[in-house]
Amino acid sequence: MSRMLNQIPRLITRSFRTSSVGYKATLGPILENKSQIQDLVNKSEWNIVDIIKFSEDEVRNIKIDSRVITKMLRASGLKDSLSEDQKKSLIRGLKLQMIFIKYLYEGDEAEFHKIEESNDDVFRLILSDHKAPKPITLKSLLSSIENLENEVDAEKGEIKSSLDISKLNGNNPTYFTVRSNKE
């Protein structure tokens, strides 16, 4: 009898398993009614403080001083003759940006909830993803430079006329010199 059992072919089974991974995160305050949603959608600018919860201890733990700001301004070709209040404002802004970048890379791990583990890879094959971009010509490049001032995007935090090229450091020989018509 045992010989017979050994001779019975075993059934081969195949299975197909799919799984999904879900993440949950809270971004900003909870919206409770239609008017709050409409206000959020119609708001063209935003603030890091509105989105990310952080403590002042986190801000204090980031080591940035006026020397760092001065080096950054010099490396950028900008004038580094700022008042102490302006430097403090730039230091705080840079610290908030570093907190925001850390949040983007690491996420708020306390708010992410992994529903199910998965090692599935998701990809898409769409022709438009693989089309070569339109080549840049001198004419299109020059026209885009002329229209640069009109292409300010408030959603990206860009402010119209926020960079005055006449305030660039014209005495910096290692980078560039900008002369304005005001001189």
From Swiss-Prot:
Q: Which cysteines are joined by disulfide bonds?
A: none
Q: Which family does it belong to?
A: Belongs to the GatF family.
* Membrane topology note: Peripheral membrane protein
Q: Where is the transit peptide?
A: 1-23
EC number(s) on file: 6.3.5.-
Q: Does the keyword Lipid biosynthesis apply?
A: no
Any Pfam family: GatF
**Enzyme type, top EC level:** ligase
Q: Which GO terms describe its molecular function?
A: ATP binding; glutaminyl-tRNA synthase (glutamine-hydrolyzing) activity
Q: Which domain of life is it from?
A: Eukaryota
Q: Sorted alphabetically, which InterPro entries does this protein's record hold?
A: GatF
Which Gene Ontology terms describe the biological processes this protein takes part in?
glutaminyl-tRNAGln biosynthesis via transamidation; mitochondrial translation
Tell me the function of this protein.
Answer: Allows the formation of correctly charged Gln-tRNA(Gln) through the transamidation of misacylated Glu-tRNA(Gln) in the mitochondria. The reaction takes place in the presence of glutamine and ATP through an activated gamma-phospho-Glu-tRNA(Gln). Required for proper protein synthesis within the mitochondrion.
Give compartment(s): Mitochondrion inner membrane
Of the GO CC terms on this record, one is: mitochondrial inner membrane
Q: Is Protein biosynthesis one of the keywords?
A: yes
Where are the coiled-coil regions? Answer: none
Q: Which reaction does it catalyse?
A: L-glutamyl-tRNA(Gln) + L-glutamine + ATP + H2O = L-glutaminyl-tRNA(Gln) + L-glutamate + ADP + phosphate + H(+)
Which keywords accompany this UniProt record? ATP-binding, Ligase, Membrane, Mitochondrion, Mitochondrion inner membrane, Nucleotide-binding, Protein biosynthesis, Transit peptide
Any idea what this protein is called? Glutamyl-tRNA(Gln) amidotransferase subunit F, mitochondrial
Q: How does it assemble?
A: Subunit of the heterotrimeric GatFAB amidotransferase (AdT) complex, composed of A, B and F subunits.
